[in-house]
Amino acid sequence: MPIIQSVERALQILDLFNEQATELKITDISKLMGLSKSTLHSLLKTLQLHGYIDQNPENGKYRLGMKLVERGHFVVGSIDIRQKAKGWLTELSRRTGQTTHLGILDGREGVYIEKIEGKLAAIAYSRIGRRLPVHATAIGKVLIAWLGEAELNALLEGYQYTTFTPATLASREALMSALAQTREQGYALDSEENEQGVRCVAVPVWNHESRVIAALSLSTLTSRVDDAELANFREQLQQAGLALSRALGYPA
């Protein structure tokens, strides 16, 4: 496997910091890395630009940045919620025969962090770790529907409404209308908007602060599940979403 030297060096810099070395001068880093200060300068500035390295204004020493704290909370939180959600997803897939997912928001995209394959609806394109367009998936709509106005506007600034099927929402206006409907009814639908032949429904997962931190979804094959059956599945999904939310401290 080819190694990208600049990336490896950047990671090695991050690994230098520990409980005994919370702050380091560039001369310290230079000695430990065996690199010139001029070479290190560009690496440190790049890490600093992206928030992974910070510089103490009082002494000029470098230290780990808050971006690592954010990423750490993201990883720990996703592991915890994944463990809690798996039981509900497994039971829902067993009862319905459909494929269920757990997704979270990461930047401008959703990400599947759990998937339980249904015996009656094998969804080949979905997998744990797959990134999801928020405008074209039920999970994506749920994950952004309850964001604050400023946060949502920032997320959608310059957003690309890529068309995946004839049913894909192709504009901000169409998406905003769908998000309003999602908030009103408490769930989102994806009717072949991301993948032809597949319909999905998703519901929010709330935490103890009454904030949406994830979404549960159920995916069906359009040819095998009619509207009435999908509505039944949606009700079961909503029950699972509420149960998981309460397990996470949601006060409802």
Swiss-Prot record:
SUPFAM superfamilies linked to this entry: GAF domain-like, Winged helix' DNA-binding domain
Keyword set for this entry? DNA-binding, Repressor, Transcription, Transcription regulation
Q: Name one Pfam family in it.
A: IclR_C
Could you name the domain of life of the organism this protein comes from? Bacteria
Gene Ontology molecular function, alphabetical:
DNA binding; DNA-binding transcription factor activity; transcription cis-regulatory region binding
Residue numbers of the DNA-binding region are 25-45
Which GO terms are recorded in the biological process aspect for this UniProt protein? negative regulation of DNA-templated transcription; single-species biofilm formation
Provide the IclR-ED domain boundaries.
81-250
Q: Which InterPro entries match?
A: GAF-like_dom_sf, HTH_MetabolicPath_Reg, Tscrpt_reg_IclR_C, Tscrpt_reg_IclR_N, WH-like_DNA-bd_sf, WH_DNA-bd_sf
Q: What is known about regulation of its activity? A: Activity may be controlled by xylonate.
Q: Which residues form the HTH iclR-type domain?
A: 4-66
Provide the function of this protein. Involved in regulation of xylonate catabolism. Represses the expression of both yagA and yagEF operons. Binds mainly at a single site within the spacer of the bidirectional transcription units yagA and yagEF.
Protein name as catalogued: HTH-type transcriptional regulator XynR
Q: Which organism is it from?
A: Escherichia coli (strain K12)
What gene name is given for the protein in this entry? xynR
